[in-house]
């Protein structure tokens, strides 16, 4: 079982959060994969979180990811009035090869999807969406994918699955499982005219950064109807980013909210 490959959440992080007595926070709501207690019972979980640091096929320059920084800030937030169970299953270590990581992630996604559990993945690079997509191979319906990104990732000049070619690989996949693909937040000067022509030829929807900034409601029905939502942090606008234009934090929260309101048990990839 690939769940056994997951490493527990850092005890140092959990102890630090516990010492801060975060009353009413997500930290007190979530069941954690810990050294002593092991993996939580996923059969009673509605949402599972895993961390991934696989970026070897990113295409883009990637820094070493400290997923606990994101966890620390996330778990400080206050819980809502929901009746859902959340489990943090820990981190998936890199395999000996990228393909090993893909295979392990494929198995994890397939198991959780069979139990109708929403999976939130933090970390990794865009190419991990490919094994997530492949995990739908026995799913009766076709798959809708939404990518919140400043580029389309439709490069065709490589046989390797990477952060710039993964969507082209999905489109050409023999399974013919892709129903629809939508990009939200693309920036024209970062996308080749060939990619734009291909998006139009395949009747895939694209919403530019300017369009989504003016009217975020355009994205709501699309995201809520998605099976896979990928949110690439390079689409964000923040100090120090090599691309100063992008989605601001308020809009990022709105788009993430739409993903959380989906009834399709989606996979949400927060790609760093």
Which ranges hold each PLM region?
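Conserved alpha-helical scaffold segments that buttress catalytic/binding sites
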Residues: 3-49, 56-270
């Amino acid at each position: 079982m690939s769940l056994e490959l997951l490493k527990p959440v850092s005890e140092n992080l959990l102890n630090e959060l516990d010492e801060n007595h975060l009353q009413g926070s997500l930290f007190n709501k979530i069941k954690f994969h810990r050294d002593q207690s092991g993996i939580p019972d996923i059969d009673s979980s509605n949402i599972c979180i895993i961390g991934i640091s696989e970026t070897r096929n990113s295409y883009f320059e990637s820094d070493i990811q400290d997923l606990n920084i994101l966890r620390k800030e996330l778990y400080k937030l206050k819980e809502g009035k929901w009746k859902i169970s959340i489990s943090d299953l820990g981190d998936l270590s890199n395999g000996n090869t990228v393909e090993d990581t893909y295979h392990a992630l494929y198995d994890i996604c397939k198991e959780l999807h069979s139990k109708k559990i929403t999976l939130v993945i933090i970390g990794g690079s865009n190419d991990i969406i490919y094994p997530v997509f492949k995990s739908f191979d026995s799913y009766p319906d076709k798959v809708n994918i939404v990518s919140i990104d400043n580029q389309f990732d439709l490069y065709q000049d490589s046989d390797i699955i990477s952060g710039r070619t993964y969507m082209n690989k999905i489109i050409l996949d023999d399974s013919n499982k892709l129903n629809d693909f939508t990009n939200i937040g693309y920036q024209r000067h970062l996308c080749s005219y060939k990619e734009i022509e291909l998006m139009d030829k395949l009747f895939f929807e694209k919403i530019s950064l300017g369009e989504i900034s003016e009217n975020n409601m355009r994205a709501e029905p699309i995201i809520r109807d998605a099976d896979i939502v990928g949110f690439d942090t390079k689409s964000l606008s923040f100090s120090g980013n090599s691309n100063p234009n992008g989605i601001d934090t308020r809009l990022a929260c709105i788009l993430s909210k739409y993903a959380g309101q989906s009834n399709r048990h989606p996979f949400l990839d927060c790609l760093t």
